Amino acid sequence: MKILIDDANIDAIKALYPVYPIDGVTTNPSILAKSGRQPYEVLKEIRAFIGAEAELHVQVVGRTADAMLEDVECIHAELGAQTYTKIPVNPAGLEAIQRLRKAQPDAHITATAIYTPMQAFLAAKAGADYAAPYINRIDNLGADGIATAKIIQDMF
């Protein structure tokens, strides 16, 4: 099991790191936008604080497989190839995950925007290392987010 902070607030990250056994940080475009700063400026500050050995998950913003793969190249160029790229599980994202896995077998891939166990299954088959279900959003849609996450966990 790993503990990841889902935040881009460097002060919050710095406050939590000495208290809890944190394995890394996840971000997304909405979290980064709340900082009011340039995304890569924030991400580089996070990377510098947590170190190269800790996990940093950064989401692509492209809408096509080609655009997502361009985002991956940019993320790796700015933050290092050890950075996990978060790719949404939609048709373009599944294509991007497969192409990235084939081109870079050692790439670190987190499948995101997952609402169902089938999406997680498809992401794993495509080559994702992690599946990140949207538990709160699943709950907001009237389903049970925790139960969905348990099903996904049991599948693997």
Task: Describe the function of each predicted region.
Residues M1-K14, V19-I22, T27-A103, I135:
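Active-site beta->alpha loop and helix N-cap motifs at the rims of alpha/beta catalytic domains
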